[in-house]
Amino acid sequence: MPRCEQVALQSLFDNDSDLYLAFRDACIEQFVHDFQLAAALLVAQQDRAAFSRLAHSLKGVLNTLGHTEISPLAHALQLEAERADWPELQRLWLELRARMVAAFGLDALA
Protein backbone atom coordinates (compact mmCIF):
# COMPACT_ATOMS: atom_id res chain seq x y z
CA MET A 1 0.00 0.00 0.00
CA PRO A 2 1.48 3.38 -0.96
CA ARG A 3 2.44 5.70 1.88
CA CYS A 4 -0.28 8.21 0.97
CA GLU A 5 -2.90 5.48 1.33
CA GLN A 6 -1.42 4.37 4.66
CA VAL A 7 -1.85 7.93 5.94
CA ALA A 8 -5.50 7.96 4.83
CA LEU A 9 -6.06 4.55 6.40
CA GLN A 10 -4.74 5.81 9.73
CA SER A 11 -6.24 9.29 9.75
CA LEU A 12 -9.58 8.83 8.00
CA PHE A 13 -10.40 5.14 8.45
CA ASP A 14 -9.12 4.63 12.01
CA ASN A 15 -6.77 1.87 10.78
CA ASP A 16 -9.73 -0.21 9.58
CA SER A 17 -8.00 -1.73 6.56
CA ASP A 18 -11.04 -3.80 5.56
CA LEU A 19 -13.16 -0.67 5.38
CA TYR A 20 -10.48 1.27 3.52
CA LEU A 21 -9.89 -1.50 0.99
CA ALA A 22 -13.63 -1.98 0.41
CA PHE A 23 -14.01 1.76 -0.17
CA ARG A 24 -10.96 1.81 -2.45
CA ASP A 25 -12.26 -1.14 -4.48
CA ALA A 26 -15.67 0.53 -4.89
CA CYS A 27 -13.97 3.74 -6.01
CA ILE A 28 -11.86 1.90 -8.55
CA GLU A 29 -15.00 0.30 -9.99
CA GLN A 30 -16.57 3.75 -10.23
CA PHE A 31 -13.48 5.22 -11.92
CA VAL A 32 -14.22 3.12 -15.02
CA HIS A 33 -17.65 4.77 -15.27
CA ASP A 34 -16.13 8.17 -14.55
CA PHE A 35 -13.63 7.70 -17.38
CA GLN A 36 -16.47 6.83 -19.77
CA LEU A 37 -18.52 9.83 -18.66
CA ALA A 38 -15.59 12.20 -19.06
CA ALA A 39 -14.90 10.88 -22.56
CA ALA A 40 -18.53 11.41 -23.55
CA LEU A 41 -18.61 14.90 -22.07
CA LEU A 42 -15.42 15.88 -23.89
CA VAL A 43 -16.81 14.66 -27.21
CA ALA A 44 -20.09 16.55 -26.76
CA GLN A 45 -18.42 19.72 -25.41
CA GLN A 46 -21.73 20.89 -23.99
CA ASP A 47 -22.26 20.07 -20.34
CA ARG A 48 -19.83 22.11 -18.27
CA ALA A 49 -21.84 21.57 -15.10
CA ALA A 50 -21.67 17.77 -15.39
CA PHE A 51 -17.91 17.90 -15.96
CA SER A 52 -17.51 20.21 -12.98
CA ARG A 53 -19.50 17.80 -10.77
CA LEU A 54 -17.43 14.86 -11.97
CA ALA A 55 -14.18 16.70 -11.22
CA HIS A 56 -15.49 17.79 -7.81
CA SER A 57 -16.39 14.20 -6.93
CA LEU A 58 -13.01 12.91 -8.05
CA LYS A 59 -11.27 15.60 -6.00
CA GLY A 60 -13.06 14.44 -2.85
CA VAL A 61 -12.55 10.74 -3.50
CA LEU A 62 -8.87 11.17 -4.27
CA ASN A 63 -8.40 13.12 -1.03
CA THR A 64 -10.30 10.49 0.96
CA LEU A 65 -8.17 7.74 -0.55
CA GLY A 66 -5.06 9.68 0.47
CA HIS A 67 -3.96 10.74 -3.00
CA THR A 68 -3.54 14.40 -2.13
CA GLU A 69 -0.81 14.64 -4.78
CA ILE A 70 -3.40 13.98 -7.52
CA SER A 71 -6.48 15.77 -6.15
CA PRO A 72 -5.21 19.26 -7.12
CA LEU A 73 -5.47 18.16 -10.76
CA ALA A 74 -9.12 17.30 -10.18
CA HIS A 75 -9.60 20.71 -8.60
CA ALA A 76 -7.97 22.42 -11.59
CA LEU A 77 -10.23 20.37 -13.85
CA GLN A 78 -13.27 21.51 -11.86
CA LEU A 79 -12.27 25.16 -12.22
CA GLU A 80 -11.55 24.75 -15.93
CA ALA A 81 -14.94 23.11 -16.45
CA GLU A 82 -16.54 26.28 -15.13
CA ARG A 83 -14.75 28.24 -17.89
CA ALA A 84 -15.40 25.66 -20.61
CA ASP A 85 -12.09 26.01 -22.37
CA TRP A 86 -12.54 22.60 -23.95
CA PRO A 87 -8.97 22.11 -25.26
CA GLU A 88 -7.52 22.93 -21.82
CA LEU A 89 -10.18 20.80 -20.17
CA GLN A 90 -9.19 17.86 -22.34
CA ARG A 91 -5.48 18.39 -21.58
CA LEU A 92 -6.14 18.48 -17.83
CA TRP A 93 -8.44 15.46 -18.02
CA LEU A 94 -5.83 13.39 -19.86
CA GLU A 95 -3.23 14.33 -17.25
CA LEU A 96 -5.55 13.49 -14.34
CA ARG A 97 -6.64 10.24 -15.98
CA ALA A 98 -3.03 9.16 -16.57
CA ARG A 99 -2.13 9.88 -12.94
CA MET A 100 -5.16 7.90 -11.73
CA VAL A 101 -4.33 4.97 -14.02
CA ALA A 102 -0.79 4.91 -12.61
CA ALA A 103 -1.81 5.38 -8.97
CA PHE A 104 -4.50 2.71 -8.92
CA GLY A 105 -3.12 0.25 -11.47
CA LEU A 106 -6.07 0.77 -13.78
CA ASP A 107 -6.38 -0.44 -17.34
CA ALA A 108 -5.30 2.49 -19.49
CA LEU A 109 -7.83 1.49 -22.14
CA ALA A 110 -10.83 1.51 -19.79
Predicted regions mapped to residue ranges:
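Two-component system phosphorelay core
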Residues: 1-110
